[in-house]
Amino acid sequence: MNRHADVPVIDISGLSGNDMDVKKDIAARIDRACRGSGFFYAANHGVDLAALQKFTTDWHMAMSPEEKWELAIRAYNPANPRNRNGYYMAVEGKKANESFCYLNPSFDADHATIKAGLPSHEVNIWPDEARHPGMRRFYEAYFSDVFDVAAVILRGFAIALGREESFFERHFSMDDTLSAVSLIRYPFLENYPPLKLGPDGEKLSFEHHQDVSLITVLYQTAIPNLQVETAEGYLDIPVSDEHFLVNCGTYMAHITNGYYPAPVHRVKYINAERLSIPFFANLSHASAIDPFAPPPYAPARGNPTVSYGDYLQHGLLDLIRANGQT
């Protein structure tokens, strides 16, 4: 029998209320989870995840190979200028999963960051509306919804870190967030590409990594696949398709001087049709939070201040170098 990591379910609704005692209790639970396995489930978030699953499943099944190629990012289709927004292709015999990544809907041709040509900023392209009616509207609304969930969760992190609950708000705004949503499909295949093995012999669909984000807010189909590295080895993360799975990214680890580490996790091989839809909660390009840690935690040497734009650009490149193009 596989062993499971301790991943608590935390009701986050109280973080939107006015009772500070309730907020402090939720923050304490977030603190224990992130200092433990590194993961927790956020319950009572207010998002219709069943609708998200159905819409995304139907959309993936309706996409033609020609559409995928036209939307493919530069790593797959050199004719396209985009590096983040677009389609991430499956590669026969090498890579089974495929995905579509989209960015902040606020980024348009007139946005100051787009005009400035800042790295990691792109105006979203979308599949043809006639073939996929309502897709853009649905996913732009979802971006707003999950952004709001992340903002609520960040109130809990701020309280847990001994700061004002609004601590992250000036850095995390819909106007200029570098956040992204990936609509990842892991298909069932009769002839699955060759698999890599973990050091413990586990067959893997995606190797060990840490998320390049402040926090990650994930919806996934209720099929066991994620594992987290612990002192006891890799443990399965329990599944739920009713709650969001939340973990810290490497920027949270950086600004807390390791108080909240970014958990090392991996995707084990399961040959089943399933979805993974992470929201990578990112700050703005210019945001730079001076690293700190709550007392009595006091590292011998603190981390340097790094702007979020530089962090994200280098972090994504490092992830590709280590694990290959997703």
Swiss-Prot record:
Entry binding sites for 2-oxoglutarate: 274
Residues covered by the Fe2OG dioxygenase domain: 183-283
Annotated SUPFAM superfamilies: Clavaminate synthase-like
InterPro entries (alphabetical): DIOX_N, IPNS-like_FE2OG_OXY, IPNS-like_sf, Isopenicillin-N_synth_CS, Oxoglu/Fe-dep_dioxygenase_dom, Plant_2OG-oxidoreductases
GO BP: any one term: antibiotic biosynthetic process
Keyword set includes Oxidoreductase: yes
Keyword Nucleotide-binding: no
A single GO molecular function term of this UniProt record: iron ion binding
Record pathway: Antibiotic biosynthesis; penicillin G biosynthesis; penicillin G from L-alpha-aminoadipate and L-cysteine and L-valine: step 2/3
Database matches in PROSITE patterns: FE2OG_OXY, IPNS_1, IPNS_2
Cited Pfam families: 2OG-FeII_Oxy, DIOX_N
Reaction(s) catalysed by this chain's protein: N-[(5S)-5-amino-5-carboxypentanoyl]-L-cysteinyl-D-valine + O2 = isopenicillin N + 2 H2O
Signal sequence region: none
Keyword terms of this UniProt record: Antibiotic biosynthesis, Iron, Metal-binding, Oxidoreductase, Vitamin C
Positions of isopenicillin N binding: 84, 88, 186, 276
Chain residues that bind N-[(5S)-5-amino-5-carboxypentanoyl]-L-cysteinyl-D-valine: 84, 88, 186, 209, 211, 276
Residues noted as binding Fe(2+) in the record, renumbered to the chain: 209, 211, 265
Principal EC category: oxidoreductase
Named cofactor requirement(s): Fe cation; L-ascorbate
EC nos: 1.21.3.1
Task performed by this protein: Removes, in the presence of oxygen, 4 hydrogen atoms from delta-L-(alpha-aminoadipyl)-L-cysteinyl-D-valine (ACV) to form the azetidinone and thiazolidine rings of isopenicillin.
Family (UniProt): Belongs to the iron/ascorbate-dependent oxidoreductase family.
Name the UniProt record assigns to this protein: Isopenicillin N synthase
Designated gene of the protein: pcbC
